[in-house]
Amino acid sequence: MSRIGRVERATNETKVFVEVNLDGTGAADISTGVGFYDHMLHQIAKHGLFDLTVRTEGDLHIDAHHTMEDTALALGAAFREALGDRSGIRRFADAKVPLDEALAEVTVDISGRPYLVHSEPEGMAPMIGRDYDTTMTRHIFESFVAQARITLHVHVPYGRIPHHIVECQFKAVARALRSACERDPRVTGVPSTKGTL
């Protein structure tokens, strides 16, 4: 049974299409109009081994906020759809990923309960490239978590270069999601004593 989620989201601010295959090979076809964000979504696909298509048209003449937020919301909804009833998955996972001087530590619970804990070094430069506001990283994960209905802890204890601080977070999230979404042949049904997630 394929685990594919497809979501289309349209507002007066953005038009978003996302398709994700949880059992993919890391193939990615991504275009949001925000170069660094595209680069981060490629990390999710590559290191999560998710086949990911993202097409976003947004009001970039204002700024990139709506584009990144709505893409993350659609991505979370697509993950939720692809997971189905969550039967047979590992559910919990964690990952540590370094990128030179920066380190990200991520723990995920595919719990049905949206919750984000996020911390990164303070005092980062406000922009990466011309259009990625570094304060959006937390908001991107908040938006994703809200729709995916997962619990996500992201901690960057140290790092100096903003590009590295952000990128190692996306890579670690990808690796943790990959492990948490994997099917475990020993798990029968939903991995919860409640019987539902």
From Swiss-Prot:
Keywords from the UniProt entry: Amino-acid biosynthesis, Cytoplasm, Histidine biosynthesis, Lyase
Broad class of enzyme this protein falls into: lyase
Domain of life: Bacteria
Biological process terms in GO annotation: L-histidine biosynthetic process
Family matches, as HAMAP family: HisB
Family: Belongs to the imidazoleglycerol-phosphate dehydratase family.
Protein name: Imidazoleglycerol-phosphate dehydratase
